[in-house]
């Protein structure tokens, strides 16, 4: 049945790790170049990438996929610059953003960014979403390419949840997001409005990450111990990178 699967397959999803690091991805893309006429013409090809491979590899990827119909590219980020690099160890935000803005030129069917909403990203999340909306409007106008985002609230590990933050910071970040939503709501998809409203409500109303693991003093102790070790082992600096949350962190 494997030899006939391509005739009836409706969607093929490629995730990772980073797919561009796998020889299997390149073999598949080579197959698409020579056998495309055999594929179900309505098949949706979804590829999830961190978008930070070496430039040469990324350019090779663009060349390979530029003629694939119904191509959807997924990536993940939720903060800007050094805060993004801190949260996602190994991230190079400048490289990520440079590669992101190259994507609409190949005219995929859709580009999707998945945000994992944790305590740390809340400092620069509105700024990050500003860039998303700016590109969303430009790419639709110039390339007729759809770009959207999801806000997926982190639940585990519990000590990285937004709910570990003190009430004053949660209120501050909630208000920032509500202001952002009010300003940009006309440019958002219904799904994006729903995700942003849900996060605003979550920061405002929800008090415990989940009942089985809620011990706020312990979670905050774990938060401090984890990032202290993270700084030492990865040569990072929490307080310098997150000046708003860092003031509270320094007092734990």
Tell what function each PLM region has.
Residues 1-8, 39, 67-68, 99-111, ...:
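A structural motif corresponding to the C-terminal end of an alpha-helix
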Residues 7-25, 35-58, 65-98, 110-119, ...:
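Core AdoMet radical
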Residues 30, 34-38, 59-63, 67, ...:
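Polar/charged alpha-helical tracts
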Residues 77, 93-96, 125, 170, ...:
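A structural signal for well-ordered alpha-helical scaffolds and beta->alpha junctions
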Residues 117-123, 141-177, 193-203:
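Flexible glycine/acidic-rich beta-alpha junction loops that bind and position SAM and/or redox cofactors
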Residues 119-136:
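Catalytic cores of alpha/beta
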Residues 178-252:
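Radical SAM enzyme core and accessory elements
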């Amino acid at each position: 049945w494997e030899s006939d699967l391509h005739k009836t397959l409706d969607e093929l999803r490629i995730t990772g790790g980073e797919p561009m690091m796998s020889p299997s991805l390149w073999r598949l893309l080579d197959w698409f170049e020579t056998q495309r006429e055999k594929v179900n013409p309505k098949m949706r090809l979804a590829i999830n990438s961190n978008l930070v491979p070496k430039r040469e590899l990324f350019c090779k990827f663009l060349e390979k996929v530029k003629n694939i119909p119904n191509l959807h590219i997924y990536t993940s980020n939720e903060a800007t610059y050094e805060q993004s690099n801190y949260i996602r160890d190994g991230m190079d935000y400048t490289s990520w953003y440079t590669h992101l803005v190259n994507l609409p030129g190949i005219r995929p069917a859709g580009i999707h960014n998945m945000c994992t909403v944790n305590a740390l990203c809340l400092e620069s999340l509105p700024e990050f979403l500003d860039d998303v909306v700016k590109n969303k409007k430009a790419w639709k106008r110039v390339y007729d390419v759809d770009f959207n985002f999801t806000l997926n609230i982190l639940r585990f590990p519990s000590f990285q949840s937004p709910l570990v933050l003190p009430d004053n910071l949660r209120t501050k970040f909630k208000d920032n997001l509500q202001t952002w939503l009010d300003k940009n709501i006309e440019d958002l998809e219904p799904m994006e409005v729903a995700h942003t409203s849900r996060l605003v409500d979550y920061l405002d109303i929800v008090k415990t990450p989940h009942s089985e693991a809620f011990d706020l003093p312990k979670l905050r102790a774990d938060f401090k111990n984890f990032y202290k070790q993270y700084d030492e082992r990865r040569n990072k600096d929490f307080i310098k990178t997150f000046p708003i949350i860092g003031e509270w962190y320094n007092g734990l």
